[in-house]
Amino acid sequence: MIDDFAPTSSTGDAALYRLLSWLSPAYPVGAYTYSHGLETAVEDGLVHHRQSLADYVATVLHDGAAAIDGPLLAASWRAAQAEDHARLDELAVLGAAWRSSAETALETSAQGRAFCDVTQAAWPDSRFAAFCARHDESIVHPVAFGVASCWQGIPLRAALFGYLSAFAANLVSAGVRLIPLGQTDGQRAQAALLDDLQRATDHGLNTALEDAGSAVPMLDLFSIRHETQYTRLFRS
């Protein structure tokens, strides 16, 4: 089992390079087009400054989608490590069904499909290609990311912490544009989330899927209401 990066190892460097590439805003999965209901929260005045933005993202990490996607990513990584393809297929179906609104389903499935396409093109792996082909449009981002991370030699904790950090950073970026905030305040909000990200990572690593779930109906309602919001910059 791969536990950590070896800083002096070329293998560790290669895995880190892949992870950083996949988490970059330049990786073409379209993350920047989604606000995860934040646009409606800003419209309602619930999120209106740096602290309320950080609080919103922390809530998503602990009780929202990340509380599901963390355990889902970890389970996918472990199933890929075991080469348990039947379990991977189950997780792909579960991940697609485990969404609270049409827009959150679109958000994760569109990014999952885009991640499959670009990762197969740039970092080809026959097992990953076959897995993505079996699920076509239904594969969600955390499942695809967990599977690819395992088969490309990226340690589980690094993959999960990185995935959640990129998810949080994308929401902060959306908040900077929507509220609006200055870039420095955006970075302060991001810095304030470190403890939340570490706790969310621990939750993802240590929570069985049967014990995972979200518990923030207000966030779900923001996402549902966003579907008919009059003026929108984001797809969710």
From Swiss-Prot:
Query: Gene3D superfamilies of this UniProt entry?
Result: Urease accessory protein UreF (1.10.4190.10)
Q: Which Pfam families match?
A: UreF
Q: Which GO terms describe its molecular function?
A: nickel cation binding
| Main location, first listed in the record | cytoplasm
Where is the protein localized? Cytoplasm
Entry GO terms, CC: cytoplasm
Keywords of the record, alphabetical order, are:
Chaperone, Cytoplasm, Nickel insertion
Q: Which domain of life is it from?
A: Bacteria
Q: Which family does it belong to?
A: Belongs to the UreF family.
Tell me the function of this protein: Required for maturation of urease via the functional incorporation of the urease nickel metallocenter.
Subunit structure, interactors included? UreD, UreF and UreG form a complex that acts as a GTP-hydrolysis-dependent molecular chaperone, activating the urease apoprotein by helping to assemble the nickel containing metallocenter of UreC. The UreE protein probably delivers the nickel.
What name does this protein carry? Urease accessory protein UreF
Whose protein is this, by species? Granulibacter bethesdensis (strain ATCC BAA-1260 / CGDNIH1)
State the gene name recorded for this protein: ureF
